[in-house]
Amino acid sequence: LQDFSLSVNAGECVVLHGENGIGKSTVIETAARLLPLESGSVSHHGKVVCDGEGRRNNPAKPFGLTLQANCLVSSQTVQQQLGNVVAICGKSFDCKGVIDSYNIGNRRNDKIAHLSGGQQRKVAVLSGLIPGMVDEESTLILLDEPDSGLDDAAVEQLVNHIHMLRNLGHAIVIATHDKRLLECATALHDLSKSTEQEPTNNEIWQVNTTDND
């Protein structure tokens, strides 16, 4: 991506859309510090977490992340996987209710490796959402095509959770083609047009780059 700037504030849901290969996943992965910058910077809560000079700093607080790849530990159970997310956030939270809400309550104690692809995707989505569910303070949540592989009921539940988290003041960035998720947006960003959004004093996340690998 070149000459790209984007910010998301507390209580906002920015949805990235556009044709395949336009850079939606690049934005998400750069925001998560998974891709290097040739120039520019990424900030969380006003603190630069990486830049084109190679500097890297830990974010001020944990953030939620669901990538296109599920990135789960196959030897862990569903409960262990989500419990680890809660522990990273330094919070206490009973995951039973949210596990049940995605109709995988009966698989709670099963290993990730034994789940179907759709069930694994539900766990990956919950892993990205839980940091917002456990924290009263505004949290950044990054979701890369979270609807991929989900059944209709799960997508409906995902939409409900996104609305809930946004109303609680969390900052959400979603890359998607799904029209149901587009309706969650407080701002749409078409990467094929790549219009710049000016940051405000309440910004939770900002990325500015003139080039990206």
What is each PLM-predicted segment?
Residues 111-118:
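Conserved ABC ATPase signature
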Residues 1-9, 40:
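Conserved beta-strand
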Residues 145-146:
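Walker B catalytic motif
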